[in-house]
UniProtKB/Swiss-Prot annotation:
GO terms for biological process: cell division; regulation of sporulation. It comes from the Bacteria. It comes from Bifidobacterium longum (strain NCC 2705). Involved in cell division and chromosome segregation. One of its GO terms (molecular function) is DNA binding. The gene is whiA. Residues 276-309 bind DNA. NCBIfam families: DNA_bind_WhiA. The lineage of its organism: Bacteria, Bacillati, Actinomycetota, Actinomycetes, Bifidobacteriales. This is Probable cell division protein WhiA. Belongs to the WhiA family. Transmembrane segments: none annotated. Keywords: Cell cycle, Cell division, DNA-binding.
C-alpha cells in the first residue's frame, strides 16, 4: 500500500489547475468517495478516504472554492489484516446547494448516477481532474513485481461507463467490469497505466512505478527492442513510436470529434507500439489490411492538423 499512498499524496499536492478543473476533481472525489446521504429526515454529503492528505484537500477545497465548511473525522476499524484508518469528510449545512454546485444533483434536484455533464463535456483539463479525483477516492494500483493494473471502484454502473468514456478522450482505453457486485474501471496495459498516472499529475510516482515493475510483458517488449539486429526493424520501431505520439496528440486535439474507424486505428497504434501495420490490421475488428490501417492513421493525423490550423486562424 505504500506506493498507492504515495500516489494519492502526490495527487493531493498537485497544483496549477483552473477553477473548473478543481471543481471537477472535487465533484469526482465526492461522487466516488460517498455522495449524498439521507440522515434523520435530512441529507448530508459524505466522502470516505484512506488518505488524510486527500481528505484535507477536499475539506480545504470545499471551503476555498465552494464556500462550504466541512469536518474531517478519523475512524479506525479492525479487519482480519489489522486496523484500517479512514478519514470521513462530512458536510451538514447547505447540503443541497453544494450538491447542485458539484453536480451530485441536476437542476431538477434529481441525483446524478454518473458524472456531472459539465465534467463529461468539459475540457481535457477537467477530464484529467475527474480521473484524479476518482483515483484519489477509490483508486488501486498494483505493487511492483505483480501483474500490472490500475483500477477504480465505482459507485454505479453509470459512473463506471462515464469514467471509461472520458478516458477515451485522453486516448486511453479503460475497461468496465463487474466484480462481486462491484463496478470497476480497469487499466492493465503498463504503458497505459504509466500514461494515466502522468496525466493525473503523479509524474514522480509514475517513474517509480515504471522503474520497479518487473512485468513479464514489459520485459518482453524491452527484450524485443533491445535485440533488434536489423536496421530496418529499428527504423520501423522508431517510426511506430513516433506515430503513436502523433496519434496521442491528435486524440487530445480532436476530443470526441473523431470518426469511429479512425479512432479504432489510432487506438491500436497507441496500444501496440511494438507491432507492425500488418499485425495491427490482423488484430483489428474486423480485420483489415496494413494499407487500410496506414490510411486511417494518416487521415486521423490530417484531420487533427486541419483542426489545429482552423483554431489558430480563428485566434488571430
Amino acid at each position: 500500500m505504500a506506493l498507492l499512498d504515495d500516489v494519492k499524496s502526490e495527487l493531493a499536492a498537485f497544483e496549477g489547475d483552473s477553477p473548473a478543473a478543481i471543481k471537477a476533481q472535487a465533484a469526482a472525489m465526492i461522487r466516488f468517495g460517498g455522495g449524498l446521504r439521507p440522515v434523520q429526515n435530512t441529507y448530508v454529503i459524505q466522502a470516505v478516504f484512506t488518505s488524510l492528505d486527500v481528505a484535507e484537500w477536499l475539506k480545504n477545497t470545499l471551503r476555498n472554492t465552494f464556500g462550504h465548511e466541512a469536518e474531517v473525522n478519523h475512524l479506525t476499524r479492525q479487519t482480519p489484516n489489522g486496523p484500517v484508518e479512514t478519514y470521513v469528510v462530512l458536510v451538514t449545512r447547505n447540503v443541497v446547494a453544494l450538491a447542485l454546485q458539484t453536480g451530485l444533483v441536476d437542476r431538477r434536484k434529481q441525483q446524478v448516477r454518473g458524472l456531472p455533464s459539465e465534467v463529461v463535456n468539459g475540457s481535457i483539463a477537467q477530464i484529467k481532474a475527474a480521473w484524479r479525483g476518482a483515483f484519489m477516492a477509490r483508486g488501486f494500483l498494483s505493487d511492483p513485481g505483480k501483474a500490472s493494473f490500475l483500477e477504480i471502484a465505482c459507485p454505479t454502473e453509470e459512473a463506471a461507463m462515464a469514467l471509461c468514456g472520458v478516458a477515451r478522450r485522453l486516448g486511453i482505453q479503460a475497461k468496465h467490469r463487474t466484480l462481486r457486485s462491484s463496478e470497476r474501471v480497469t487499466l492493465k496495459d503498463p504503458d497505459a497505466i504509466e500514461r494515466m498516472l502522468k496525466l493525473m499529475g503523479a509524474t514522480r510516482s509514475a517513474r517509480e512505478w515504471t522503474g520497479k515493475r518487473s512485468d513479464g510483458e514489459a520485459r518482453g517488449k524491452a527484450n524485443r527492442l533491445a535485440n533488434f539486429d536489423d536496421a530496418n526493424m529499428r527504423r520501423s520501431a522508431k517510426a511506430a513510436a513516433e506515430a503513436s505520439e502523433k496519434v496521442q496528440h491528435a486524440f487530445e486535439v480532436l476530443g470526441d470529434n473523431i470518426p469511429d474507424n479512425l479512432r479504432q486505428a489510432g487506438q491500436l497504434r497507441i496500444d501496440h507500439v511494438d507491432k507492425s501495420l500488418e499485425e495491427l490490421g490482423k488484430i483489428a475488428e474486423p480485420q483489415i489490411t496494413k494499407d487500410a490501417i496506414a490510411g486511417r492513421i494518416r487521415r486521423l493525423l490530417q484531420l487533427a492538423e486541419k483542426t489545429e490550423k482552423a483554431r489558430a486562424a480563428e485566434g488571430k
